[in-house]
Amino acid sequence: MENNKFNETVEKITRLILTSPQKMIREEDLINLSEDFNFDDIIGNVYLNLKNSGFEFIISKFLDQKYYVLTIEGKDDNITPSQYGTLALIAALAKEIDENMKITDLKEIFSEVWSSDVEFLIQNEYLRELKDLGLIKVTPLGKAVLKNIIEDLQLKNLLDVFKNK
């Protein structure tokens, strides 16, 4: 009986993740959905279900909270190459200056692509505008989109690419 309830909980969480319009979910919410079962056991089984269905489920930290992000292999077709490049540059800048990027500075740096790229990235939750603090941060979804290159993402390397062109 206990095993059936465990499997039902795993199935319920997996279904919720797959059908949710949001591509990310807070760890705290997943813990609450896990009922009285061990969270690590539940999330491990959810991860296997998603992996067996061709998805990836990665962990990212944002504003001192852990998020789980549902992704698939390859690039997101909703994002243009220019938007990918803009997001990569912003992520590299964030890494260099400890993630606190002023909106005013970014508007100046990305003035040519602000309305086409940066606003799209904000509207689609790849970037979050913290208006009260005057900052922009890369969201877990934005980090997930760049997951295959984020470890090597350094501002110096990106600038070298553009310098060599």
Predicted regions mapped to residue ranges:
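Short, amphipathic alpha-helical interaction segments positioned at domain boundaries
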Residues: 73-90, 142-165
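Short, surface-exposed recognition loops or helix-turn segments adjacent to catalytic cores
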Residues: 102-109, 119, 133-134
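Eukaryotic partner-binding/assembly regions in large regulatory complexes
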Residues: 1-65
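Short alpha-helical segments that sit at the start of domains
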Residues: 1-13, 62-91
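Accessory beta->alpha helical hairpin/"wing" motif in late/C-terminal subdomains of nucleic-acid enzymes
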Residues: 60-74, 128-154
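Short amphipathic alpha-helical interface segments
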Residues: 10-28, 79-108
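Intrinsic disorder
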Residues: 4, 111-112, 132
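Short amphipathic alpha-helical interaction segments
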Residues: 37-46, 108-124
